[in-house]
């Protein structure tokens, strides 16, 4: 079958959930037996989000091949079977960089390089490069229709239909139908204006996915259809749901997947949504609950920890329990102390991060978890701070810290990796992507994974300082996972504790609702046990 292309645009406001919509459509296509590819085009000029503040961009999602990408790719991987790559996310910065390099090589034979056709051709080439050997290529256009930054991308997808044929390209526009409480009614005008802007660019949407907090009445759908030049059946309600894993089910009930395959002239089997229904049922009707604190410095924007929070929910689904998340500002712990912060908490998790700010608050939280025998999970920087806390307060090593935060520390138990010492550029230069880890027999990590070899994704410059290994092990630290090629410590544990584990990698990037990551399943299980014993 010739590859079909589904382009998703958004209008009215940002953060409507285009990424979730794209992921849910991907899930529905796979449930019908189709092969899909997922891709996000971001209109910002940064080459990638790797150096952007989490407060501006949210989480940076890392792929197996080491790409630092938009958090929407996390949704794509959690909802579909796809393992994404560097081709799955590209930006204006990457497009212009590629075109300028070609111009310098002389690829354009002295021609004047312009947005049309050179930039738009480059965009189309990147779309095609990610759509090989699939039935449906789903492409999300970042930004909001009307933004000047998005224009080259919209022009490129406009050309796509002309070149590939109307029957092979579908435009789906996600828009907002707000309810105005004072008027007591839904308003369609924002959707009308958003579609008007899209049509002025030359794109007539085929399906309107209308985000709303309630069902849109039939007469209002008819009004939207009339003013936006689509059939009434093409106006689909995207109602708010309690659980984001309910979105594919809600879309199917609205007939969205049927509209898509009808338009693209694809014959498929009926979708099997049994697994999604099971997940939603477990989410809504848990047998028990547990409370876990995430201690970090980006907690004002919880999107900074999107994959992390979802992985904990996956752990809850596996344990048939509700996971209540409490976000704790590590800087606040530095200023005010731990106090009663963790009084009703069953597990403490310290995630990755960068910079000195808030580090002592994380160390205080780790000490509380260790001394009070509360299950603790440290990820990336969280593992490194667990090593610092153990070295200081158990092994009695003075002036002990990470050289990232104190270059002249007498005892840098965490230090910069050898191959990072001469690196001066920030973007794309960390240890990124999937690397193997060998697990030690008889350890907690080995029991959790049930195997001796695993592969996990990384994003870091600093590592455990092996010069302190013997001293820390004598104090009771267990090194349970190692990347043997270079002797890099990947997992640490401590003896005589219900559940205390830190890992250098980011397991949250490989967790899915149908396949919870073993570490999160085990950590949530330990927290649930602590809740029962409290």
Curated annotation (Swiss-Prot):
Residues given in the record as L-glutamine binding sites: 353, 381-384, 404, 461
Enzyme Commission designation: 6.3.4.2
Pfam families named among the record's database cross-references: CTP_synth_N, GATase
Pathway per the UniProt entry: Pyrimidine metabolism; CTP biosynthesis via de novo pathway; CTP from UDP: step 2/2
Region (Amidoligase domain): 1-266
Activity regulation annotation text: Allosterically activated by GTP, when glutamine is the substrate; GTP has no effect on the reaction when ammonia is the substrate. The allosteric effector GTP functions by stabilizing the protein conformation that binds the tetrahedral intermediate(s) formed during glutamine hydrolysis. Inhibited by the product CTP, via allosteric rather than competitive inhibition.
Further comment found in the protein's record: CTPSs have evolved a hybrid strategy for distinguishing between UTP and CTP. The overlapping regions of the product feedback inhibitory and substrate sites recognize a common feature in both compounds, the triphosphate moiety. To differentiate isosteric substrate and product pyrimidine rings, an additional pocket far from the expected kinase/ligase catalytic site, specifically recognizes the cytosine and ribose portions of the product inhibitor.
Function as written in the Swiss-Prot or TrEMBL entry: Catalyzes the ATP-dependent amination of UTP to CTP with either L-glutamine or ammonia as the source of nitrogen. Regulates intracellular CTP levels through interactions with the four ribonucleotide triphosphates.
Protein name: CTP synthase
Source organism of this protein record: Syntrophotalea carbinolica (strain DSM 2380 / NBRC 103641 / GraBd1)
């Amino acid at each position: 079958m010739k590859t079909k292309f589904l382009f998703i645009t958004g209008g009215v406001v940002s953060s409507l959930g285009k990424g979730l919509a794209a992921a849910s459509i991907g899930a529905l296509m796979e449930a019908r037996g189709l092969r899909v590819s997922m891709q996000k085009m971001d209109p910002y000029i940064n080459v990638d989000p790797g150096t952007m503040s989490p407060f501006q961009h949210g989480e940076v999602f890392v792929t197996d091949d080491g790409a630092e990408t938009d958090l929407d790719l996390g949704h794509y991987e959690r909802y579909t079977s796809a393992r994404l790559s560097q081709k799955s996310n590209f930006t204006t910065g990457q497009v212009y960089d590629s075109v300028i390099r070609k111009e310098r090589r002389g690829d354009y034979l002295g021609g004047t390089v312009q947005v049309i056709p050179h930039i738009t051709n480059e965009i189309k080439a990147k779309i095609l490069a990610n759509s090989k050997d699939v039935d449906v290529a789903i492409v999300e256009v970042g930004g909001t229709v009307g933004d000047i930054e998005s224009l080259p991308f919209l022009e490129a997808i406009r050309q796509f239909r002309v070149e590939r044929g109307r029957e092979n390209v579908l435009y789906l526009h996600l828009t907002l139908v707000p309810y105005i409480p004072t008027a007591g009614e839904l308003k369609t005008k924002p959707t009308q204006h958003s579609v008007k802007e899209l049509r002025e660019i030359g794109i007539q949407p085929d399906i309107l996915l209308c985000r709303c907090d309630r069902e849109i009445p039939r007469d209002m759908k008819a009004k939207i259809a009339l003013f936006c030049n689509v059939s009434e059946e093409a106006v689909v309600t995207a109602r708010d749901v309690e659980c984001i894993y309910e979105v594919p089910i809600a879309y199917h009930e609205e007939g969205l997947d049927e509209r898509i395959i009808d338009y693209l002239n694809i014959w498929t089997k009926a979708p099997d949504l049994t697994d999604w229904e099971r997940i939603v049922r477990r989410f809504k009707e848990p047998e028990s609950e547990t409370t876990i604190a995430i201690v970090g410095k980006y907690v004002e924007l919880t999107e900074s920890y999107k994959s992390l929070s979802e992985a904990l929910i996956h752990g809850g689904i596996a344990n048939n329990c509700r996971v209540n998340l409490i976000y704790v500002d590590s800087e606040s712990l530095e200023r005010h102390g731990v106090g009663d912060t963790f009084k009703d908490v069953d597990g403490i998790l310290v995630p990755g991060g960068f910079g000195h700010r808030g580090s002592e608050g994380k160390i205080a939280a780790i000490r509380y978890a260790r001394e009070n025998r509360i299950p603790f999970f440290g990820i990336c920087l969280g593992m490194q701070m667990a090593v610092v806390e153990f070295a200081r307060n158990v092994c009695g090593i003075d002036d002990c810290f990470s050289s990232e935060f104190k270059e002249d520390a007498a005892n840098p138990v965490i230090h910069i990796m050898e191959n990072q010492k001469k690196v001066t550029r920030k973007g794309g230069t960390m240890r990124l992507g999937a690397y193997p880890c060998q697990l030690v027999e008889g350890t907690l990590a080995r029991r959790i994974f049930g195997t001796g070899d695993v592969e996990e994704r990384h994003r870091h410059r600093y590592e455990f300082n092996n010069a302190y290994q013997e001293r820390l092990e004598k104090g009771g630290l267990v090194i349970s996972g190692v990347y043997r090629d270079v002797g890099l410590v990947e997992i640490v544990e401590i003896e005589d504790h219900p559940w205390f584990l830190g890992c250098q990698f980011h397991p949250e990037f490989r967790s899915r609702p149908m396949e919870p990551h073993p570490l999160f399943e085990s950590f949530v299980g330990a927290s649930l046990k602590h809740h029962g014993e409290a």
